[in-house]
Amino acid sequence: MKNKIIELLQSSLAKLEINGVDIYVVTPKNNDNGDFSSNIAMQLTRVLKKNPRVIAEEIISNIPEDESIEKIEIAGPGFINFYVKKSSLGSVISTILTDNEKYGENNVGQGKKVLLEYVSANPTGTLHVGHARNAAYSDSLARIMKKSGYNLSREYYINDAGNQINNLVISAIVRYKQALGLEAELPEDAYHGEDIKVLGQKLKDEFGDSLLEREDLESFIRDYAVAYEMENIKKDLGDFGLEYDVYFSEKSLYENGLVDKALDSLREQGYVYEKDGALWLETTALGTGDDKDRVLIKADGSLTYLTSDIAYHKNKLDRGFDLLLDVLGADHHGYIARLKASIVAMGYKAEQLEVLIMQMVQLLNNGEVVKMSKRTGKAITLRDLIDEVGADAARYFLVMRSADSHLDFDFAVAKEQSSDNPLYYVQYAHARICSILRQASEQGDFNIENCNYELLTDEYSVELLKNLAYFPEIVAQAATNYEPHRICNYLQNLASSFHKFYNNNKVITENKEQTESYLALITAVKITLRNALELIGVSAPEKM
């Protein structure tokens, strides 16, 4: 219906010989402002040098008649509000029943090649709750963007080079020796997590004390420990519903000479200089807002973390992606300007990189704060979260707030089986519809394919029909704004509309024609609930 209104406006503008204007149509929050509204008249004020209400009148007078439109009105300074005939709203049901699992698809992405990199936790320990939020948000965003016509690839960057891996090796060797009964003390800045103890025991069980005789002990442990940690990370992410297209090794950047190539590229562009024995990147001259220049190679010859990151992002862009999306934690906020500066320095555009920042998660249980501490072995992990509330609830609660806002996650609420639990409220709507459809199947031979949608004129049916029609637009908005929480908001609204409908209408009655129209309506709701839940990686149970 929204597309039809855009076409009607385009037809009117063509008659008025007005071309090259983007037409925006929205769904007003207040029903008094119609079913759809456009500000096109106000957009044209500067061009036509007329009062927007006068322009609105001219546009309306040239809109072709359409049997689905009840009336068109001018509101406020020049909004054009469209009121759709209630009997026409039912056409969305046919669309949903035909599209089924494809309902919600749109082409706002137009095939744009996007690389989404997320979680990318160091392979030095168990994933914590901050990683869980990143995972739930990013995987949902990937699903939404794919539904919206983006050609998207999902990537995990394995930080298998650098000091954190040196610490991992030291920690693993100490735990291995301790497992053998030897005296060995874990340094204070080493990794103290339970997973490293398990790793030490695993090394002992598999190799006995034979590793102590190896000259390449550290090199062997390095490869073994990284592989072990990545296996655990992949297992946890898989159980959380995540899949990746590519796992990219930081170490491969060095092995394949990509770091040197990136440095050569920066030198060729003329944005590096030497000072105090170090090599610097002149980020302050690149217009991305960095407040000071950044070191690439230290005076002792070692590389900074930024240098390998620059090489990685050059590699991403060289692979032909139009847009890079990096999802990082709140502690990386100051990193954005220097990263953007680095790709500008290599001849790319700053807007080819978007860094999405995840804010912190606070865990609660019945309103009381649950403390986290990563290096003491007492951190609440992603695995703990899955075991405590289940993957569905964990994902839903981690996605339902905007990524740039702090999130309180209450275990007690997530486990409640009541309307106070937003996920339960949504999933129960789906299960309730499945129950009604089973009853209908047992009670009679109903045909929902050619039913009379004009019978769906009561206020609760109309509200449902409008909400159903909004779904593709909501998906497109969630994709272009990188805001998966819009899907959760939509699910709450759709579930609420359904529960109101159910409480005020008896679906299966002796009136077969009315029953069939209601069954068609709730089937469309069921499909849309399922499709929306799938976008955030949550199941749609048929029984609860």
Predicted regions and their residues:
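Non-catalytic interaction-recognition regions
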Residues: 1-90, 101, 105-544
